[in-house]
């Protein structure tokens, strides 16, 4: 089941299902990247990040969480979240078993939240965390902040969020990632809501440049197409 439009290889290996973008030559790092509650691994934002990052030497696996593998539509159920985190771990292991270099993990919205919880439970899981539109709290309910696990994160974390995201303001998110016990960086996308995929936001390119600095990745002189 090739994804010829984006030159990615379909992957179905145990609990891992998705698409793998490989750079020319040996990867200098890898990223396991997953989707939000309403989508799957074909989401435009994930494809854009995978395309841009792989063009600079970073292998990217965009993968479906367990709840999406179980059914094509519908939101995840809170009781099934541990299974989604298991999928995150399996995706990281898949990449680690296939090449040298640091393995990063992350996701958009719910996917980023599950990735963050997975690394809070195991600081050796990945070398860095990417949070795209972290859902800090339900819209209009800042008192229900999802921050309890953040102090247990001990790896560098890059957070990217829009100024119009109802799930958390830039000020709230900066304060939240300040709880993380490692280096952090925050990218504020002016005018963006929860969806960061619009071309004008250049999310893939901006996150890449911040990531190579924060995570110490040597991408050499390759260029982003």
Where are these regions (language model features)?
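Primarily recognizes the serine-hydrolase "nucleophile elbow" in alpha/beta-hydrolase
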Residues: 88-155
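Short beta-strand/loop motif that positions the catalytic acidic residue
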Residues: 153-154, 159-161, 165
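Catalytic active-site module of serine/aspartate enzymes centered on a nucleophile-bearing elbow/loop
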Residues: 192, 200-225
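Serine-hydrolase catalytic machinery in alpha/beta-hydrolase-like enzymes
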Residues: 9-102, 197-198, 203
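Catalytic histidine neighborhood in serine/cysteine hydrolases
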Residues: 179-195
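Acidic catalytic loop of the alpha/beta-hydrolase fold
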Residues: 163-168, 195
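Short alpha-helix in the alpha/beta-hydrolase fold that links the catalytic acid
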Residues: 46, 143-146, 155, 169-177
């Amino acid at each position: 089941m090739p994804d010829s439009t984006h030159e990615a290889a379909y992957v179905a290996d145990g609990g891992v299902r998705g698409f793998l973008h490989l750079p020319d030559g040996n990867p200098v790092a890898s990223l396991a990247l997953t989707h939000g509650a309403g989508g799957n691994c074909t989401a435009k934002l994930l494809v854009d990040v995978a395309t841009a990052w792989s063009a600079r030497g970073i292998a990217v696996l965009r993968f479906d969480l367990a709840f999406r593998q179980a059914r094509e539509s519908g939101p995840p159920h809170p009781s099934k979240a541990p299974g989604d985190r298991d999928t995150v771990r399996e995706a990281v292991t898949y990449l680690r078993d296939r090449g040298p270099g640091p393995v990063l993990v992350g996701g958009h919205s719910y996917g980023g939240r599950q990735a963050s919880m997975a690394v809070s439970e195991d600081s050796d899981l990945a070398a860095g965390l990417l949070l795209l539109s972290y859902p800090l709290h339900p819209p209009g309910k800042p008192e229900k902040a999802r921050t309890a696990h953040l102090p247990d994160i001990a790896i560098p974390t890059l957070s990217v969020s829009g100024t119009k995201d109802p799930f958390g303001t830039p000020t709230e998110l900066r304060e939240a990632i300040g709880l993380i016990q490692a280096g952090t960086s925050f990218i504020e996308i002016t005018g963006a809501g929860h969806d960061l995929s619009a071309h004008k936001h250049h999310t893939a390119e901006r996150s890449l440049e911040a990531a190579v600095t924060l995570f110490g990745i040597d991408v050499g002189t390759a260029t982003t197409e």
